[in-house]
Design a protein with these regions (language model features):
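N-terminal non-cleavable signal-anchor helices
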Residues: 4, 30, 57-61, 582
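Short, flexible helical or helix-coil boundary motifs
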Residues: 24, 28-31, 52, 247, ...
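Hydrophobic alpha-helical bundle signature of multipass membrane enzymes
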Residues: 36, 41, 59, 65-558, ...
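N-terminal secretory signal peptides
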Residues: 1-40
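N-terminal export signals
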Residues: 45-66
Length: 602
């Protein structure tokens, strides 16, 4: 017989029926972590007052049996039936208190990992390896050290007034440097998440990432349908050949070589042993079409729907090609230019289209949840209501509204973690700034330590012949956002959302009726008839599409997105762990596949 969970009986059977959290050790009043010894009486009284207030509110608002008599509130009265005992308000509130203490204890017990950098900030006194956009620069584009020091002073003292004294070079403000210092009440702390150090300025790996970015700029108006092994596109073939000559290119390969099918596909970077990096390709990312199905399907939203057709930038919308325009952006100014758009919406069908989608964004992950909820995708088998004979979930727990609330929460919390790496650890320069170093080394003979593989590449030669510049062409007139490059915030957001969606839904479900944009008319789609596409694989592809899409715009290195995907995954897992502590349902955890192919149960 199932024991009433609200029973006050002290039987052994009733004790066993209590949830795991109910068994947690009661916190000691003398605990130094949560209560100071001199404030214990005040803390106790305050907590008692909270319990009393909660009881009154619950009694008045939570039950139709509440009544008012002689000006005094009377708690809810229950019919005298066998299993209808009065709800224990204090026990419920105390359980919430103990769950929160346990969540804090668990998170506090996670060790703080090392946070190695690439050493560029210390290596170069003129800060050419560090992000300084938005601050004033000299005529070469080197930051004025007084301004850079005003930034690092604020980041060191963390005094809100010091942030207001950062010396800016123009009207453009820095993006949320204090945001990462906010303390999240759920999930892991930013300092407890490790990412590999980014490639150093002078390294062959950084050179390889730069060459890839120059090719992404050159191929912006190439259809994504040409990124397959039977391609006849000469630019695609030239890019593949050039990338295969690089000594340290870490993007996806087949049989040890870059192919048209692997070109510009995504990857994930985890912390390896020591300060090394472990490079992986998530399951499904190399399967089928380049673009995830979640970017091609109509989003059903109640009685409405959201079309997957997007506003696209016209070919030739490339910016920061002129050094003075580039310098104005570095100084926090404006290019004075804007994107010219195609008046007719269409499906994402070119490299530029995906870059523009990643520039502006849309209801990407909310949309994916709505698609999954409507196309027959089963819930994750670990969902306790999958096998319930009498109940279903709701917005409270284990149904779409609950999942969507966690998606929104995850998006905020992961940005705190990503921006902490940006501002308080790495301060890595953006690709557009690297392009300025390349330009100045060639045009002004500046002695910058750029690896020779950049200058020997066909990517740089073709950039000059196409755009008449050695700067990295940008797809956005403002260039990159005014915070540093590593790790990528948009990619981290993609990862936390995709990981949560894999926890909520059955990732092994095969997506029905997949489509691809019609290469002859990208305002339409046609059926895809290749190998099966699973929910998990297409969610992984969605995350990597978004991460690489930022590179299509010219604003992020591959490693920015690849490291951020691992970071976002870890934030999602920590949120699920905290959330689990509060459930009343019998729940054995969500099992899903991480980006590195390992199975986890949370």
């Amino acid at each position: 017989m199932q024991v009433d969970p609200n029973s006050h009986e002290g039987s052994e059977q009733a004790a066993q029926a209590n949830s795991e959290i109910d068994k947690l050790k009661q916190p000691s009043v003398a605990s130094k972590r949560f209560f100071g010894s001199h404030a214990s009486r005040r803390s106790f009284l305050g907590r008692a007052g909270l319990f009393s207030a909660a009881s009154v509110v619950a009694g008045v608002l939570g039950s139709p049996f509440s009544s008012k008599k002689g000006g005094d509130f009377v708690q809810a009265q229950y019919p005298n039936r066998r299993y209808n005992r009065a709800f224990d308000y204090n026990k419920f509130v105390d359980k919430a208190y103990r769950v929160r203490l346990e969540a804090a204890r668990v998170e506090r017990s996670i060790p703080i990992p090392p946070h190695p950098t690439n050493g560029d900030e210390e290596r170069y006194p003129n800060k050419i390896g560090s992000d300084s956009r938005g601050l004033p620069h000299n005529q070469l584009g080197e930051v004025k050290l007084e301004a850079y020091n005003s930034l690092t002073k604020a980041l060191t003292t963390q005094n809100p007034n010091d942030y207001e004294n950062i010396i800016l070079g123009g009207d453009r403000k820095l993006v949320n440097p204090q945001g990462p210092l906010a303390i999240s009440l759920e999930g892991i702390n930013a300092a407890q998440i490790a990412v590999p150090p980014p490639p150093a300025l002078a390294s062959a790996e950084r050179a390889a990432e730069a060459v890839e970015l120059y090719w992404q700029a050159l191929l912006r108006d190439v259809p994504l349908s040409k990124l397959q092994n039977n391609t006849d596109n000469p630019k695609v073939l030239a890019a593949v050949e050039d990338l295969n000559k690089l000594s340290a290119f870490r993007g996806p390969k087949q049989n040890g070589r870059v192919t048209p099918q692997t070109l510009f596909r995504g990857s994930v970077n985890y912390v390896g042993s020591g300060s090394s990096t472990r490079y992986v390709i998530p399951p499904g990312v190399l399967d089928g079409p380049y673009l995830s199905q979640f970017l091609l399907l109509t989003i059903p939203w109640g009685t409405q729907s959201v079309s997957p057709l997007i506003r696209t930038a016209l070919p030739g919308n490339d910016f920061l090609l002129n050094f003075q325009e580039w310098l104005a952006i570095q100084n926090g100014g404006s290019s004075g230019k804007s994107i010219k758009y195609d008046p007719k919406n269409r499906y994402i069908s070119t490299v530029r289209d995906l870059g523009e989608y990643a520039h502006i964004g849309g209801p990407t992950y909310l949309g994916a949840s709505l698609i999954l909820n409507s196309n027959g995708t089963p819930l994750n088998p670990g969902n306790p209501y999958v096998r319930s004979k009498t109940q279903i979930g709701s917005n409270a727990t284990f149904a779409l509204g609950h999942f969507q609330a966690l998606l929104n929460l995850g998006s905020s919390r992961v940005i705190r973690a990503s921006y902490w790496q940006k501002y308080y650890v790495h301060r890595t320069l953006r690709p557009e700034a690297f392009g300025g170093l390349v330009y100045n080394k060639i045009a002004n003979k500046a002695q910058y330590p750029i690896n020779s593989e950049v200058f020997n590449s066909q990517a740089l030669a073709q950039t000059f012949s196409t755009f008449n510049t050695y700067l990295l062409p940008q797809a956005y007139p403002e260039g990159a956002p005014t915070h540093s490059s590593y790790s990528g915030g948009a990619a981290a957001t993609a990862a936390v959302n995709v990981t949560l969606l894999k926890a909520f839904f059955d990732e092994n479900f095969v997506i029905p009726s997949p489509v691809v944009p019609d290469p002859n008319d990208p305002t339409k789609v046609i059926s895809y008839s290749g190998s099966p596409l699973t929910v998990g694989g297409e969610l992984n592809k969605l995350a990597t599409n978004y991460a690489i899409g930022r590179g299509h715009g010219g604003i992020h290195w591959r490693s920015d997105g690849s490291a951020a995907l691992a970071l976002g995954e870890e934030v999602a897992i920590s949120l699920l762990k905290d959330e689990r502590l509060g459930y009343n349902e019998i729940f054995n955890g969500f099992t899903f596949t991480k980006f590195d192919g390992t199975r986890v149960t949370v």
